[in-house]
Regions:
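Generic signature of intrinsically disordered, low-complexity, basic-rich segments
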Residues: 1, 14-16, 150
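Phosphate/pyrophosphate-binding loop motifs in nucleotide- or prenyl diphosphate-using proteins
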Residues: 2-5, 85
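Sec-dependent N-terminal signal peptides
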Residues: 4-14
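N-terminal secretory-pathway/extracellular module detecting exported/lumenal segments
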Residues: 18-83, 88-170
Length: 170
């Protein structure tokens, strides 16, 4: 009986390891949960706890980008916008506004009450060059343990390319 229980547990563990999984909705400290990807008056953050693996395609991840509004119209100051984004790590494509909308909240980091949605057409982008979007996408893929464009160290390579570009400009 003990042997049967142990074999059953091992089998369930092995089956569980082979299934594509969602990343756990981790309770991260605020400073660990959000990665600032764009500085400025209205900084944009990657919500690392929102990264999910598509159950139909393990190379496809979804995540939220959050913009904290600290400038512009007084009515919007102190609010935030949340945008669902998807990335296919294998073929380096991203879909911005995957759910065709921005969600606007009363507080920073998509906290507080949801005020309204702003419709926005989803846009598919194929990333061939090093750009801010490709850096964000590679970061998401790396965080989820996926290769970006089938390259193990894609993020490091892109950072080196950016360093070379900035050296040639000076």
């Amino acid at each position: 009986m003990k042997r049967f229980a142990i074999l059953t547990l091992i089998s369930l563990f092995c089956i569980g390891c082979s299934q594509p999984k969602l990343l756990e909705n981790q309770e991260l400290k605020q400073q660990d949960r959000y990665l600032k990807v764009i500085n400025g008056q209205n900084p944009i953050y990657l919500d690392k706890s929102s990264i999910r693996v598509n159950s139909d395609n393990s190379n496809e991840l979804s995540y939220y980008l959050i913009t904290n509004i600290s400038s512009s119209e007084q009515a919007l100051k102190g609010t935030s916008m949340k945008k669902l984004t998807k990335v296919n790590c294998a073929d380096k494509t991203t879909i911005l506004s995957a759910n065709n909308q921005f969600e606007v909240y009363t507080q920073f980091f998509a906290q507080g009450e949801k005020l309204f949605d702003i419709p926005e057409k989803a846009e598919k982008i194929e990333m061939q060059n090093t750009s801010l979007l490709s850096l964000i996408s590679a970061t998401v893929c790396q965080y989820a343990g996926k290769k970006f464009g089938e390259k193990e160290n894609a993020l490091i390579e892109m950072q080196k390319n950016l360093e070379k570009q900035s050296e040639t400009k000076h």
